[in-house]
Regions:
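RNase H-like (RuvC/DEDD) metal-dependent nuclease/polynucleotide-processing core
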Residues: 2-9, 15-66, 71-304
């Protein structure tokens, strides 16, 4: 039976692209809020984090779960076509990445090789993906520094990122793979984890807004909704914790739970995206939870 908007469990994920196991600062952090308690976890590898997410979904057959991830779930309009993908653009790219990325139990991965191959599919010369250690450069395909953009490249920014930039925010492009704050590598390594989750639980896992549209129907028992978040949007109250990433996932989970209790969470899933942009957002680019389509970030973004 469908139910009104209310999540029994809220999971917030800060992903990492480290190529070796790591805990502490700049590693993977999960905050899990089940209404009774908020637990923060620090898995050392993406494999460990993937197993944890799978176990959460497996156990939630009679409850509802929101999973917020801090990496881009889509790419700028035209990316799927430029890569030669067919079908719904967002899922064609997810399938390509899930079938191409190799990421082992110790975090060793081939993300730079996949980025280079993607660049080669899109056109001659490096780009649109860029940013890698000098030892991982691929001549004419992947450069350490930002290359000049060409007419054949998809746009640098998704619409949601353009909105954020117009409102004084500084998101990173999905194409940048390396550098402080860059999220491109996290997307390359995170999307395959989510695609495997979808394949394992095809009737239960939705990805907002790709499978839901810009909104959410009443929730079903066992339903899992994955959404993109940007922790920088949320102002926390605790600045004393030793690890910033741990504080941020806890703050975002607390913020979302507060909105859920107050009946305000549904509004985050219904941004006022212009009609001309909605198709691209739903079919390929995705959106960030809490960002308005017109006025930028939602106004009340403080943990309470």
């Amino acid at each position: 039976m469908a139910r009104a908007m209310s999540f029994d469990r809220i999971v917030v994920v800060d992903w990492s692209a480290h190529s070796t196991p790591k805990v502490g600062a700049d590693s993977i952090w999960l905050a899990v809020d089940d209404r009774r308690s908020l637990v923060v976890e620090n898995p050392a590898t993406r494999a460990d984090a993937s197993h944890r997410l799978t176990s959460i979904v497996e156990a939630a057959v009679d409850s509802t779960t929101l999973i917020g991830v801090d990496f881009s779930l889509g790419y700028p309009i035209g990316t799927a076509r430029a890569l030669g993908c067919t079908g719904r653009p967002w899922h064609a790219v997810w399938t390509l990445l899930a079938d191409s990325i190799v990421d082992d139990e110790r975090n060793r991965n081939n993300r730079f090789e996949v980025a280079a191959a993607s660049n080669a599919s899109i056109g001659d010369g490096p780009g649109p993906f860029w940013g890698c250690p000098p030892s991982r450069r691929v001549e004419h395909c992947l450069s350490s520094t930002k290359p000049e953009r060409t007419a054949g490249h998809p746009p640098e920014w998704r619409h949601v990122e353009s909105v954020l930039r117009r409102n004084g925010r500084r998101p990173f492009s999905s194409w940048q793979l390396l550098g402080a704050g860059a999220v491109g590598s996290q997307s390359l390594l995170g999307i395959p984890v989510l695609e495997r989750l979808r394949r394992r639980f095809p009737q239960r896992v939705d990805v907002w807004p790709f499978t839901t549209g810009l909104g959410l129907p009443p929730l079903r028992p066992g339903q899992v909704v994955v959404a993109e978040i940007w922790p920088t949007l949320v102002t926390g109250t605790d600045t004393t914790g030793p690890v910033r990433d741990a504080r941020q996932v806890a703050d975002v989970a607390t913020w979302l739970r507060g909105l859920d209790r107050g009946g305000e969470l549904r509004g985050l899933f219904e941004p006022d995206v212009a009609a001309a942009r909605r198709s691209a957002v739903i079919d390929e680019e995705g959106w960030v939870l809490g960002v308005s389509g017109v006025d930028g970030p939602a106004r009340n973004m403080t943990v309470r």
